[in-house]
Amino acid sequence: MASTFVCSLPNPFFAFPVKATTPSTANHTLLGSRRGCLRIKAISTKWEPTKVVPQADRVLVRLEDLPIKSSGGVLLPKAAVKFERYLTGEIISVGSEVGQQVGPGKRVLFSDVSAYEVDLGTDARHCFCKESDLLALVE
């Protein structure tokens, strides 16, 4: 998931020397400078999910993978699966104001409306939600 992308594109107007009737240093400095280039650097940061500590009454939940097949064996398209209103997942870490019933390792059911999904740079999907937004503990 973590990737590095670097792209350099030269400006085509400065690729060839410009002939001027009078010698000008401006034309020569633009040929060798990087002002005529576009440089993009996108670096994704990777965090260890167990080391991320939520604040106050928030919990960090690792989402379970959505089903690819229905119970009857029919393949489900992603468009049909992504609009599920209720999600289940495993609690990874909890904030300091969370009660004793909710702790790391427990499975919970919650609504996707109240969850804030984050990308921690791993293959798994994670989200933050409040303890009061948890609907049920799943045994």
Swiss-Prot record:
Expression by tissue, per the entry, reads: Expressed in leaves and stems. Expressed at low levels in germinating seeds, seedlings, rosettes leaves, flowers and siliques.
Q: Where in the cell is it found?
A: Plastid, Chloroplast stroma
Manganese among keywords: no
Give the transit peptide, as a residue range: 1-39
Q: Which UniProt keywords apply?
A: Chaperone, Chloroplast, Plastid, Transit peptide
Chain residue ranges for the region called Cpn-10 domain? 51-138
From the Swiss-Prot or TrEMBL record, what is one GO molecular function term? protein domain specific binding
Quote the function comment for this protein: Functions as a co-chaperone for protein folding in chloroplasts.
Supply the PANTHER family for this chain: 10 KDA CHAPERONIN 1, CHLOROPLASTIC-RELATED, 10 KDA HEAT SHOCK PROTEIN
What is this protein called in UniProt? 10 kDa chaperonin 2, chloroplastic
